[in-house]
Swiss-Prot record:
GO terms for molecular function: electron transporter, transferring electrons within cytochrome b6/f complex of photosystem II activity. It comes from the Eukaryota. It comes from Drimys granadensis. This is Cytochrome b6-f complex subunit 6. HAMAP family: Cytb6_f_PetL. Belongs to the PetL family. Component of the cytochrome b6-f complex, which mediates electron transfer between photosystem II (PSII) and photosystem I (PSI), cyclic electron flow around PSI, and state transitions. PetL is important for photoautotrophic growth as well as for electron transfer efficiency and stability of the cytochrome b6-f complex. The chain crosses the membrane at residues 4-26. The 4 large subunits of the cytochrome b6-f complex are cytochrome b6, subunit IV (17 kDa polypeptide, PetD), cytochrome f and the Rieske protein, while the 4 small subunits are PetG, PetL, PetM and PetN. The complex functions as a dimer.
Amino acid sequence: MPTITSYFGFLLAASTITPALLMGLSKIRLI
């Protein structure tokens, strides 16, 4: 079970961090 929980947590973190990085890159490109 811990492995599934950690995997789900990693997936959730990736789904929240990826959009933030894309937004940062788009802002840098606009500037």
